[in-house]
Curated annotation (Swiss-Prot):
PROSITE patterns: ARGINASE_1, ARGINASE_2. One of its GO terms (molecular function) is manganese ion binding. Pathway: Amino-acid degradation; L-histidine degradation into L-glutamate; L-glutamate from N-formimidoyl-L-glutamate (hydrolase route): step 1/1. The lineage of its organism: Bacteria, Pseudomonadati, Pseudomonadota, Betaproteobacteria, Neisseriales. Mn(2+) 2 binds at residues 145, 147, 236, 238. Its cofactor is Mn(2+). This is Formimidoylglutamase. It catalyses: N-formimidoyl-L-glutamate + H2O = formamide + L-glutamate. It comes from Chromobacterium violaceum (strain ATCC 12472 / DSM 30191 / JCM 1249 / CCUG 213 / NBRC 12614 / NCIMB 9131 / NCTC 9757 / MK).
Length: 309
């Protein structure tokens, strides 16, 4: 059951049908609907807890829906709410499996999944759904993140999802294609850089993600897009500077400006290869006057503006 009561906001009825906002456009997921964007919440921060982070991201989906609700709606694709997948019992693996099943279901119905996390453990569940829905496609993972999230650990955490994806690729004979944009040398040990090299990952440091470097970044991005059939885009909001995104477990001391992230994410959305996207690590407990919620909602809104199905 989808709780649609959360989708409320300003109504500009005097300005006519073209004055809609998201809360007036989002529908509960229908059994049969025109291809659109399916919003899925992953109300989970069990991975963050296991990774010794600051919990609270389980409240992200609800807060981000509220932030999206009042944004102006410019018609591109239908918007659907496919409800939440929660992890209330600490069983992260089961929650990730349920998320994967939900993602696969919305893809089978012709929609593009937009997942609102939740910690970055969201990524492995999202991957399970994408890989099941596209078994024969070369799926590339593009991660905007200050961290590689390639940790080796005895149990899954918010720091292990891409190591898990690499292992899943190995089990199923897939090539692990991973591009991480915004990596902070201060936040990743040499061991993590060594792991990234061993797995054949590509990356770009946060210090090489400035606006004046966009031409070079776009070139690297274009090469990666050319090498894959489909893209899984994941935006860890801690890639943004702390001044723009305070509402995360690990705020960035440097970070990548939101204008750069938006421009590059928009290019990915317009490529025609986007198979699924998520925004993760938003923690409303640490937000300041909704600054973080508004920044995250802006990125989700921007993706929707660039998509065509």
């Amino acid at each position: 059951m989808v709780d649609m009561k959360i989708w409320t906001g300003r109504v500009d009825a005097a300005e006519g049908e073209a004055a809609k906002r998201w809360h007036q456009a989002v529908q509960a997921m229908p059994e049969n609907g025109a291809p659109g964007i399916a919003i899925i919440g992953f109300a989970c921060d069990e991975g963050v807890r296991r990774n010794q982070g600051r919990v609270g991201a389980a409240g992200g989906p609800k807060t981000l829906r509220k932030a999206l609700a009042n944004l102006a709606y410019h018609p591109t694709l239908p918007l659907y709410d496919a409800g939440d997948v929660a992890c209330a019992d600490g069983d992260l693996a089961a929650a990730q499996q349920r998320l994967g099943e939900r993602v696969a279901q919305v893809i089978a119905a012709g929609h593009l999944p937009l997942v609102l996390g939740g910690g970055h453990e969201t990524a492995y569940g999202h991957w399970l759904g994408l890989s099941a829905a596209h078994p024969d496609k070369r799926i590339g993972v593009i991660n905007f993140d200050a961290h590689f999230d390639l940790r080796q650990a005895s149990e899954a955490t918010s720091g292990t999802p891409f190591a898990q994806i690499a292992a899943d690729c190995a089990r199923h004979g897939r090539v692990f294609r991973y591009l991480c944009l915004g990596v902070a040398e201060t936040a990743n040990t040499q061991a993590l850089f060594d792991t990234a090299r061993r797995l054949g990952a590509e990356w770009r440091l946060d210090t090489d993600m400035n606006g004046w470097q966009l031409a070079d970044i776009r070139g690297q991005l274009a090469e990666f897009l050319d090498s894959v059939d489909a893209v899984y885009l994941t935006i860890d909001l801690d890639v943004l500077p702390a001044a723009q995104m305070p509402a995360v477990s690990a705020p960035a001391g440097y970070g990548v400006d939101i204008a750069v992230v938006e421009a590059l994410a928009g290019r990915i959305a317009k490529s025609g290869k986007l198979a699924g996207a998520d925004l993760v690590e938003f923690n409303p407990d640490y937000d300041i006057d909704s600054h973080g919620a508004k920044a995250a909602a802006r990125l989700a809104w921007s993706l929707s503006r660039h998509l065509r199905r």
